[in-house]
């Protein structure tokens, strides 16, 4: 069992800020765990930042299982959280349970489900059989078409009511935490105060119990990123500089340098071997 558990995350509410970051492969997960994050999250955002999809709607269970396995092998301390992709739980509670089990078998400690009130029965059943669940309300990318695109949530009485209802339903169903995405900070604060489980914000202000960002946004790997994301590095330029230098050195004959390859020390021995091989191969 890893050091950080859902129980530990729950106990952090109001005491210590929860840190969460996405990771989609072994080396990224190694670094995230070494950096001390509480939660390493295999998000369905991989569809967009890894596979170049226009949204998360085309992400499959097979992709989530594949990436969860890679991340789980790397993480020793943090809680490993895997997203339930679109279509993996909407049809029936039974199908949702089967797919959640697959993610746990791939190495996840818990699963995340978008939506709240509508999926309370699934959350309750998953928790009953021993699969911890993190909920997700506010902007739910899997439902962005219904929401009218990617936009900030909580600006109307109806939206505030829906967000709070989702949060309370998730709490009652046994979720150990809730993601609040792109919600007005006042609303995120209200939800955080009204539920006993931690809230983890993304673009939802400072009044939540923790924060999550996407790996690629933190590192500046793309030209653009969501307005709520902060770049802590500009790795796109660093990577471009590095691989361009490699290409140039190959073109100019500078790579490999003498320290990057090995030769026979005994040239006479190599000549003997070469002559014998050429003779055997009739060359």
From Swiss-Prot:
Keyword Metal-binding assigned: yes
One of the GO biological process terms: pantothenate biosynthetic process
EC primary class: transferase
Catalysed reactions, semicolon-separated: 3-methyl-2-oxobutanoate + (6R)-5,10-methylene-5,6,7,8-tetrahydrofolate + H2O = 2-dehydropantoate + (6S)-5,6,7,8-tetrahydrofolate
PANTHER family the record matches: 3-METHYL-2-OXOBUTANOATE HYDROXYMETHYLTRANSFERASE (PTHR20881:SF0)
Subunit structure: Homodecamer; pentamer of dimers.
Official protein name in the record: 3-methyl-2-oxobutanoate hydroxymethyltransferase
Organism: Pyrococcus horikoshii (strain ATCC 700860 / DSM 12428 / JCM 9974 / NBRC 100139 / OT-3)
